[in-house]
Amino acid sequence: LLWFSVWDKNNAFYLGGAFSHLNRANQSFDSDIYDGLYSKFTIHSGLDYIFPYSRFGLSPGIVTFIQGPSLQVNGGVNLKFLLSGNRRTYEAFQFGTWVRLANKVDSGILADALILSTRFDYEQFGIGFSYDMNISSLRQATNLNGSFEFSGIYNICGPERRNVYCPRF
């Protein structure tokens, strides 16, 4: 489920959520024992803002995952640069830093990872790259080695002019 508000061609706000594992499937290997998979709730929100009379903007965001006793929050901000000077094509580059917080098994909140991200958008297509670097006590096991993530983005709304613009997140 996603709700968004578009102020103009470059500025928008979104808020959404999802619910997974509605039927709480049995994850036990023993057919006599029921071990139901916890349902998962996802809540996300963000903003895409271009400064007035500028090609620069900010794209802050947050996503929260809750599944049984587990909690994870990813939050951060990307700095966005509009590359195209004309109104006919949309080209943008963004990069930023995010942090992943999670609850500890015993108690408290743990700053688990620092996430460096970058993205290039052209019209309704985009390609992204991020690197998660472990900053918690788990870094001893990983030697600060993180993980790479690639993403491909396709916005269904095309470039045609509209009275209500499709947001570009």
Task: Describe these PLM feature segments.
Residues L1-I43:
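Hydrophobic, aromatic-enriched interface-forming segments
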Residues D35-F169:
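Outer membrane beta-barrel transmembrane domains
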